[in-house]
Amino acid sequence: MEQLEVNGKKYKILKLLGKGKGGYSYLADDGEQTIVVKQIHHEPCDYYQFGDKMQAELRDYDRLHKIGIPMPRLIDADVSNERLVKEYIDGKTVYEMVLDDTLPANCIDQVKKMCEVLYPANTNIDYFPTNFILQKEDASKLYYVDYECNDYMEEWNFENWGAKYWSKTPVQNAGIYGICGKSSKLKSEC
């Protein structure tokens, strides 16, 4: 795959960033800027039930944007081809920083600040560490690069689920393989 088209605009694919429950994310170029093109897929997922994935992406983006979660700007959406164009956030994932023992304390502080606005809005996000990038340009800003969110459930909040994967522990390593599969290329999202 060399190019993807979104609403008539062509994007040169540079590389696969990652595969998640809902789609493949590609680093791409439109001749002016580097962006992310996400192609929705319909592959089965044992642990998650989907409705209309494209509508869920758009609805979740709107919900998180209103709550004020730092995330990549949605640039374009091609509903018929099930593709999104998102701002590219250059930097390391929390997953990469945990493995390198370079995760700054301010990342934990920032995800907790996200929780302070998410929980009162009855919302959880996917706290898996591949979904968070510390921006290279401004190393003090953490972004949630997925748009997925769900109604709040205590068992799936950061403290009870996500935090287990934000440290180098057997739980994190088991979780990485249990959720993503051993052959996964963990980059920007799992």
Model-found features: residue ranges?
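Conserved structural core of kinase catalytic domains
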Residues: 50, 69-108
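ATP-binding glycine-rich loop module of kinase domains
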Residues: 10-55
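The N-lobe alphaC helix and its flanking beta3-alphaC-beta4 segment of protein kinase-like domains
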Residues: 49-67
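Conserved catalytic-loop position in the HRD/HxD motif
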Residues: 126-127, 131
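A short, low-complexity linker immediately N-terminal to eukaryotic Hanks-type protein kinase catalytic domains
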Residues: 1-13
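C-lobe/activation-segment region of protein kinase-like
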Residues: 122-124, 135-190
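Protein kinase catalytic-loop region centered on the HRD/HxD motif
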Residues: 115-123
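Active-site beta-strand termini and strand-to-loop segments that position acidic
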Residues: 27-31, 87-88, 135
